[in-house]
């Protein structure tokens, strides 16, 4: 079954920045935005996996503060910002590593903050903009994933705070929080101590489903949705 519901051209004339565009959910989002007519600037340290006249690849290490600040300033013209870059790490108490926690924080929280700090004020000055952070259902907490969950919970706090700042100026900011999604991250050895859980739906979330939801939040039809944590979890967040 196709997850596509938006009409062709729904994002024509939209200039979007998508971090993590070379793989996984970020790739699916960038690909869908291109199909809907957007101009996409893909930010990733990995080689680009998309092409075409409306796709612009920017090789940036999101763990490099100076590089992120520089590219954020260069992309201040953007109408939409999607921060989809992310990694998974899992470990129980007694096996937590400070370096892992710092890496997760820099990628999920600090990089998002640096990008938004340069791009969102410019959006607000123009009176229009859309921001989506790709979070996780795990933000509510899960055994063995405390460091990862903490950074995803921080994303929700960022979004709610930022949304309150810029709502009167035509900018919406939301989190989309998937449950386990069918990407290569499911097989990441860094999550070996905390295996993915199949949601009640009976299958993992498809990257295209996440991409379609993100794309909708970038459209004019989503103008009244801001400061929200929108879960796409196949029932995983429901009471057992």
Label the predicted regions.
Residues 2-7, 226-240:
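Short C-terminal tail/terminal secondary-structure segment
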Residues 22-23:
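Conserved glycine-rich cofactor-binding loop
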Residues 87, 94-114, 132, 155:
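Catalytic Tyr-X3-Lys loop
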Residues 88-102, 144-147, 185-189:
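Conserved mid-core segment of classical short-chain dehydrogenase/reductases
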Residues 121, 164-165, 223:
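Alpha-helical segment proximal to the catalytic Tyr-Lys
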Residues 130-154, 159-168, 180:
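Catalytic loop of short-chain dehydrogenase/reductase
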Residues 167, 172, 225-227:
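Short, small/polar-rich loop/turn modules that mediate ligand/substrate recognition or access, typified
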Residues 199-210:
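A conserved structural motif in NAD(P)-dependent oxidoreductases
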